[in-house]
Amino acid sequence: MSHFTKIQTTIQDLNLLKHALTDLGLIWQMNSSHIKVGENNQHKVDILIKQDNLSHIGFTWNDNRYHLVADLQLWEQPWSLEVFLDKLSQKYAYYSIIEETKKQGFEKMQQISQKDGSIKLIVQRWNY
């Protein structure tokens, strides 16, 4: 029995999503593709992540953010769904912060991974 799920995320920026997926070591394809949902249905996705069992997962744009589309019964990633979403959110937030600090004239000086899994960023801006 299929457990097709469409999970809303807070992800709105495609380029930051691609950076986050790459950082997680996932190989993704960018184009409109269809993934199998259940026995005879398909669902359109904008980013496709292939799985060995051919029950691929993906991300689809819906109004103002991306949704994760997957059959949870056929989930074949190195992390549980919850851990995957946590890691993806952290990577996405990291790249969002880096991009915003660059826009404001800051430069990343140091990055420290904390014991609790969080990341401490030290940025600097020179005033001229």
Curated annotation (Swiss-Prot):
- The answer to whether the entry has keyword Heme is no
- Give the highest taxon in the source lineage: Eukaryota
| Signal sequence segment | none
Where in or outside the cell it occurs: the entry states: Plastid, Chloroplast
- Chief location of this protein within or outside the cell: plastid
A Pfam cross-reference name: DUF1257
Q: Keywords in alphabetical order, please.
A: Chloroplast, Plastid
Please provide one cellular component term from the Gene Ontology annotations of this protein.
Answer: chloroplast
Similarity-based family: Belongs to the ycf35 family.
According to UniProt, the name of this protein is Uncharacterized protein ycf35
UniProt organism field: Pyropia yezoensis
